[in-house]
């Protein structure tokens, strides 16, 4: 697959030397495909790799001291469990949730790298999902399930496009890693991990998300509005077989990631 030219970066946040060296990738996949397990493996694999996790704790309003990405702002502390609210009353909370989810992803992709990463010779940032999957997978699916109405969907697309155009040079990605698993396997893993907010998720919803991931990242037939996204390199990893406790499978996945990085 042809690789597009390295993006132009004009961010005042980081020095030009770092921006020329760093590679930014998102880890995409269905709910419970294995992303959290995968990014933990990545984080341990190299001192030059940094993982920016999905801010689940923020969405659940859970205060934690384990990771600064999971801390809450003052305005959130009495905001309730937005993820639970989404699953309990999707038609009421879908637009609110997707608006906040996208905002939190923009913040994550603009976050200042760690000092260790700034000094790395070959720095890599991995983001657990991205502003693109927020729109083309999750918000789109909620609209198709009629949990987001036409007016909300039009507004979401309008500000999402404007937002990304404003920050394009700072949040653009070099590539995407798609963790591919069947909806049935994702359902099994969802039940195994036992996240309370997710217990009402139906297989039909996972099938819808799977179809969208396939269209976007596997078949590459999905229509997208951002030119950089149309030609972005994608590596597909089959994670239908469990790899959480299998060191051989983990090493095989890491080898593929290293090959992909070398091609960018």
Curated annotation (Swiss-Prot):
Enzymatic reactions: 2'-deoxyguanosine + ATP = dGMP + ADP + H(+); 2'-deoxyadenosine + ATP = dAMP + ADP + H(+); 2'-deoxycytidine + a ribonucleoside 5'-triphosphate = dCMP + a ribonucleoside 5'-diphosphate + H(+)
Domain of life: Eukaryota
Binding-site list for substrate: 54, 87, 98, 129, 134, 198
EC number: 2.7.1.74, 2.7.1.76, 2.7.1.113
InterPro entries, alphabetized: DCK/DGK (IPR002624), Deoxyribonucleoside_kinase (IPR050566), DNK_dom (IPR031314), P-loop_NTPase (IPR027417)
Compartments, as annotated in UniProt: Nucleus
One term under GO cellular component: cytoplasm
Pfam family, one: dNK
Active site: 128 (proton acceptor)
Record keyword ATP-binding present: yes
GO biological process terms on file: deoxyribonucleoside monophosphate biosynthetic process
Record SUPFAM superfamilies: P-loop containing nucleoside triphosphate hydrolases
UniProtKB keywords: ATP-binding, Kinase, Nucleotide-binding, Nucleus, Transferase
Quaternary state and interactors: Homodimer.
Family per record: Belongs to the DCK/DGK family.
Protein's recorded name: Deoxycytidine kinase 2
Annotated source species: Xenopus laevis (African clawed frog)
Gene encoding the protein: dck.2
């Amino acid at each position: 697959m042809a690789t597009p030219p390295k993006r132009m970066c004009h961010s005042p946040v980081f020095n030009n030397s770092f921006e020329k060296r760093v590679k930014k990738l998102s880890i995409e996949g269905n709910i419970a495909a294995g992303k959290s397990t995968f990014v933990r493996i990545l984080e341990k694999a190299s001192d030059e790799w940094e993982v920016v996790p999905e801010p689940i704790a923020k969405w659940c309003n859970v205060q934690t001291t384990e990771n600064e990405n999971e801390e809450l702002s003052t305005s959130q502390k009495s905001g309730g469990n937005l993820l639970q609210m989404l699953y309990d009353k999707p038609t009421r909370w879908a637009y609110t949730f997707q608006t906040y989810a996208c905002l939190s992803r923009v913040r994550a992709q603009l976050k200042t790298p760690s000092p260790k990463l700034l000094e790395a010779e070959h720095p890599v940032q991995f983001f657990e999902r991205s502003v693109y999957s927020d729109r083309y997978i999750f918000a789109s699916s909620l609209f198709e399930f009629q949990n987001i109405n036409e007016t909300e969907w039009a507004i979401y697309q309008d500000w999402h496009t404007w937002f990304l155009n404003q920050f394009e040079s700072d949040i653009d990605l070099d590539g995407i890693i798609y963790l591919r698993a069947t909806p049935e396997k994702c359902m099994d893993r969802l039940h195994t991990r036992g996240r309370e907010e997710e217990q009402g998720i139906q297989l039909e919803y996972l099938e819808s998300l799977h179809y969208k991931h396939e269209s976007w990242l596997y078949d590459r037939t999905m229509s997208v509005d951002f030119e950089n996204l149309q030609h972005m390199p994608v590596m597909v990893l089959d994670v239908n077989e469990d790899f959480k406790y299998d060191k051989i499978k983990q090493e095989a996945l890491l080898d593929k990631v290293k090959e992909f990085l070398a091609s960018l």
